[in-house]
Amino acid sequence: MRRSARCGMGSALLLACLAGPFSLGQAQTGVPPNPPVGLSGAGGPTLAQGMAALKDNQPRDALNDFQRVLVSDPNNVAANLLASTAAVELFQGPLAVQYAEKAEKLDPENWKIHTTLVAAYAGAGMKQQRDHERALLRELHGTGAPDARLATGFLVEMFPIGADRVDAIEYFEPLGRFHTYYRFLVRQPDGKRIREIDVQSDDFDQKSWADAHPAEAAAGDRQFQITGHADDGNTVDYRMFSGKPDYDNIRVMVVEALRSHPLPGSQPAGAR
């Protein structure tokens, strides 16, 4: 039975692994008390209040606070970026894009803005723009600023499934012993994580599969396993598949797994 090391992420901005808005790092523990490092502009107490609201899983209050800052200081990079973050958590994709693109215009060299643009474009259904930003993040991870190189991955998307929320994480390199490519964290409305779904392709299984499917393996395909871990310790092997680790195809499989294997008390239907 497989078990990967969990990254205990809080409800706002994937708090326990945050290196910046929607990027995963190694030593971050929460939303900082001041505007994110590298972001210009001082929003005063209202900006701090909004960040506290994000940390407390109150994105609507946070968005209101950031919008108040932007009324008097529309070019505040931090407020625009954090307003986009709050809009992503509220599944308001077009609004998230509006604020993230404004932040990028004001501070085009800041890689953390691109991590937010990925989730914003995903929420707005803008797949071409989303994938452009994903490719850019991979380039910056290899050649960019130190925090970009230290990050392990980033949030691709937040999407609702019933009353719950799913945070979809993509890793720059397969993570851990079992080579996790994607991780989907399922959260209750209060932000509590109730399930983790990992998309993995470990070398042992891959070797056996490649021996049986040499042509596919030579073309770069792999065998993957989708495994769920509930917070009560139960593990479910949902399915196996072979091919490329395409996010959109995997998302469909994960949503189907959540619908087919609901947790007690959850409302799994209705994912979009």
Predicted segments, located by residue:
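Alpha-helical segment of the N-proximal tetratricopeptide repeat
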Residues: G41-S72
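Helix-start (N-cap) detector for alpha-helical repeat units in TPR-like alpha-solenoids
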Residues: G43, V77-A78, W111-K112, A145
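Register position in tetratricopeptide repeats
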Residues: K55-D56, E89-L90, G123-A124
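Canonical positions in the second alpha-helix
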Residues: R68-V69, K102-A103, L136-L137
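Structural marker of alpha-solenoid helical repeat scaffolds
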Residues: S72, L106, E139-L140
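Canonical tetratricopeptide repeat
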Residues: L82-A83, T116
